[in-house]
């Protein structure tokens, strides 16, 4: 069973004519573990390794390079591109985010994205 904080290889399809992330890339599972265990749908946030080319947004969360993440370099979680997917789109598990502080920052970024903080509206 996949769990919140796991990093999977995900097929985001072909979005070449848009600014959305596309192709096969890592993503962090952000849906709650009860939903992850019981639903055929999972919620993920795509990652980008282009940390130096991205303009900072309050929905971006830096993911440091750590062995347990399974990533080969630092990345940015793009919470503004949060997406619900069929679990069939998940590839292999790459690693996990074990740092609670990073997951807390990602939760806040998701709240900002959905307008939970009036200062960003």
Where in this protein do the model-derived segments appear?
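Compact nucleic-acid interaction/catalytic patches
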Residues: 20-24, 29-65
């Amino acid at each position: 069973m996949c769990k919140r904080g796991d990093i999977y290889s995900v097929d985001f399809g072909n979005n070449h004519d848009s600014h959305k992330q596309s192709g096969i890339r890592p993503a962090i599972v952000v849906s709650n573990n009860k939903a992850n265990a019981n639903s055929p749908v999972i919620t993920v946030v795509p990652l980008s390794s282009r940390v130096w080319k991205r303009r900072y947004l309050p929905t971006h969360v830096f993911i440091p390079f750590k062995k347990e993440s399974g990533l080969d370099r630092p990345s940015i979680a793009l919470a503004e591109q949060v997406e619900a997917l069929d679990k069939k789109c998940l590839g292999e598990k790459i690693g996990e985010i074990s740092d609670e502080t990073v997951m807390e920052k990602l939760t806040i970024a998701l709240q900002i994205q959905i307008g939970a903080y009036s200062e960003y509206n």
